[in-house]
Amino acid sequence: MPLYNHLKEHRARLGVNQQEMGRLVGVSRQTISQIERGDYSPSVTLALKLAKACQVTVETLFQYEEDNHEAIS
């Protein structure tokens, strides 16, 4: 299941750059960049911190596309 995120859009809405967002949530600029590109899936804790920093829910910030052939148990 691919994980999609809207971090870049929400970060831009707040007017903060990757460095500032990283500082707000305690990670590097490179980590923020990797998350935005989809190269890194954040931990639950980091996802919660990012959502709080962006003033949105985790569900608004991160979404996954469900594979219709894959059962969720």
PLM-predicted stretches and their roles:
Residues 45-60:
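DNA major-groove recognition helix of helix-turn-helix/homeodomain DNA-binding modules
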Residues 7, 21-22, 32-35, 61:
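Conserved hydrophobic/aromatic packing and binding residues within compact polymer-binding modules
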Residues 27-41:
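Recognition helix of helix-turn-helix/homeodomain-like DNA-binding domains
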Residues 62-73:
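Short, charged recognition helix plus adjacent turn
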Residues 5-24:
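Short basic helix-loop element that most often maps to the first helix and adjoining turn
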Residues 12, 26, 37, 66:
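Residue-level detection of the helix-turn-helix DNA-binding "recognition helix"
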